[in-house]
């Protein structure tokens, strides 16, 4: 898909107190091993866990609380319009509150699939069009964790592959959002 804006950001949009409240709440919820989309909810073998952890090694909590969506959704709507995407959307998947311990990571991945979801419930038949990241902790409080985008609009015969990568430094301050 050709679009003129690959992402839209809001610097320090969410107040620090709300960020702290989300963190405090997320830390009280039961966590699970984070998975990538291809592994679903099925029981994994040791080999499957090892393969998955090559791409993603972190823990997460699923949050779908109205008070959190009320803070985040206005920015998604605003970005969708301001960036000129104008996607139709009527709901969000559960938020992933991800916990990274020392040396954990989430490597390169695409946030959408080429086919609609085939599962029970409200996501059935839908495709993720928009993804959002909210920086709950100030970027000065940890090392690593850079959010990079791969726009895939490069020709390896013309320029180096790394020249198409964009690091989203706009969202380092606490409370910043990128859609």
What are these regions (language model features)?
Residues 1-177:
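Fe(II)/2-oxoglutarate oxygenase catalytic core
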